Amino acid sequence: MQSALTPNTAAFLEYISPGHAPTSAPPAALFNNMPVPGRDTPEDTPPSVSNGSQPSAHQAPSDDSDSPTPEMPPAQPDDAANTDPLAGNGANKRKAGRPSAVLDDDDDDASDSDLPSGHEDKKQHGAGRAAAASASGSGRRGRKSGGGEGDGKRELSKSERRKEQNRAAQKAFRERREAKVKDLEDKVAELENKAYGTQIENENLRGILKRLQEENVALKQSAFTFSMPVNSRNSPNSNNGSFSAPAPQNRKPLTPPQSSNDDSLKAVDDIPMLPHRHSSANTISDNSSESLVSLRSTDRTPPALFSDHFNTYALGVVPVPPPSSSSQPTQKYPSASNGQQSISSNSNSSNVISPPSADQSEFNALWESLYPNDVENLVSQNASQNQGGPFTLLNSQPDSMSFASAGNNNSMNALFNFGAPSSPSISNSAQPSVNPAPASVTQPANHITQNLGATGQASDWNRFAFREPTAEASAPNWDLTDNSVNEFLASLSGDTTADATANDYLNNDDEAFNAQLRKIFGNDNSPSAAFNLPSTSFSPNNYLNMSPSPMMPLSNSQSPQSSDSRSNTNVSSGRGNDISMADSPEYSMGSSRTSVSHDSTDLQGKATTTTTTAIRSAKNYSCKSDNEVIHVVDEKGRVIKPSELWMRFGMQHENSTEHLLIDDLCDQMRAKATCKDGKMQLDITDAAVLFRRGERRPSQ
């Protein structure tokens, strides 16, 4: 049958359409033959041109508007069916590596393409899928759907296994992490327990160390005896290598120690021993055949941790000399002082006790030579006299342990008694008296003596702490040197009334001694203050802001005008005459702190007043010594400030201050001042006289 198309049109259609393509293909198949990347899959690619270029004898013309539909030969479907398996196999080969999801989509699209719908071109892969689906047939779709379902199950099983593996890995990680955290928590708890135990142990060790240190200090400050056998003979106590601690026992009379034949123990490193604080007797033990020189007390209380043996080290560490030889036995025997018997070393050059080597008879003879009247008589005699040595321990001086009671009962004056002689010593100064020596054992040789203000008194080194104010021997014996001291002071001052001056101060020993010094140095300071030459340069601060300093006395560098002003001031006032020495015998100065003023117009600086005047002067001196500041009072009794006084007298002008010497002015004001209500006050008129007299002085 002839075709209605022109040859050119038929050739073009053959060229663009495959030979096995059905005549009922959709129009989209003519335009979407080439694959588009991202839209068409490989299976949508049309067959090769070589396959399509073969002419088909049974090809039907394409559907045209002006041509009828050609009849389809019956063998055409068979040819298509025969050629489809090859094409399907090729498609399956190309689809082997595709995932299951793509296969499912292809199946769905292939199934949808069979529906009589005119919107196939709206699908994502419309043309290619429609051509492949129409050519493959129902068998191909069933085969493809069956393979897709198997691949989907296989892919689902892999994802499930992967999820299970992830869950298992996460679970194992959590378990490992929990185990690690638990392990760390256990270690932390263990370390905390160890730290707590270590802290407790450290606290215990600190306590032990502190206790050992206290015991060490106590042992260093206490005198103890270490006993050890001297020879190889065994004795009941020879194995005792411990310290012999003080043990209380009843008081027994002192007897000579036993012979050395029975003494098998020796005190090693024996330092001078002192009695306990409240002990009343320290005896040498004679209960056993061994004579141990140890410290024993009758105190019923246990020994204190820090006993009074600390006084042994008050002057430093006491060296322990080597033991003396047996040919020169040295002993320590008790000395009675205030009912106490102490083992002392005042008459012994050795501090180590060695057992006597002589027999009992020689030892008794030596004992009798030392104590001809027996020790008990000596103890009773001293107990009746109630006299002690010049130096006692700290425990026998409870007042001297504190400076709070320094001004009560002249305890400090008695403690450091460097004052003038007392009334009995002054009255009997012409007759030297020797105080009885304290009851301490003395030997002709190898003894240590300290004669401090006393004669024939052997002082105990261990008792060199403080003086005892209750005993007569505690005060220095001024009887031997009183006359020489008084004569020396009188010779320096040119005064022949030294004895009368001393008698005026019988009730005040310090004033008597200070009066002698004032005659020599003319001021209230120590002798070294006489050589302190203050600067004569003027400074308003010395008067405005500072009180008169006791360390700035008058010196020889003062002008004659200042001396005349002091002399005229004292003559006009009729008071303020003291007994001090100065540049001229014609003037008087009463400005010193320790000066003793007298109500007399006599310009000679000699003490010829009565005892009543001396007492009044002593009161005035005490008032002046207690008050260093002078208050200038006006007519209304109001205290004037130094700045106001300075301005009132016109001191702000420089020419008004050229004639003033601040030191002289302060001394003159102090001499004019009177004691009222415990304060030093100066009337404004007296102050004006002092200032204006200085102004008139240059014109004179």
Swiss-Prot record:
Residue spans of biased composition, Low complexity class: 127-138, 231-244, 335-358, 542-573
Family matches, as InterPro entries: AP-1-like (IPR050936), bZIP (IPR004827), bZIP_sf (IPR046347)
Stretches the record annotates as Transcription activation 1: 213-400
Region (Basic motif): 158-182
Composition-biased stretches (Acidic residues): 103-112
Cellular location(s): Nucleus; Cytoplasm
Region listing for Transcription activation 2, in residue ranges: 452-577
c-CRD: region residues: 642-675
Motif (Bipartite nuclear localization signal): 34-41, 67-74
Cellular component aspect of the GO annotation: cytoplasm; RNA polymerase II transcription regulator complex
Mutant phenotype after disruption: Does not affect virulence.
Annotated stretches, region: Leucine-zipper: 184-191
Keyword ATP-binding: no
Family, per entry: Belongs to the bZIP family. YAP subfamily.
Role this protein plays: Transcription activator involved in oxidative stress response and redox homeostasis. Regulates the transcription of genes encoding antioxidant enzymes and components of the cellular thiol-reducing pathways. Involved in antifungal resistance to fluconazole.
Database matches in PANTHER family: AP-1-LIKE TRANSCRIPTION FACTOR YAP1-RELATED, TRANSCRIPTION FACTOR KAPC-RELATED
Entry note about domains: Contains two cysteine rich domains (CRD), referred to as the N- and C-terminal CRD's, n-CRD and c-CRD, respectively. A nuclear export signal is embedded in the c-CRD, with which the nuclear export proteins interact only in the absence of disulfide bonds (or otherwise oxidized cysteines) within the c-CRD or between the c-CRD and the n-CRD.
Identification of the protein by name: AP-1-like transcription factor yap1
Gene that specifies this protein: yap1
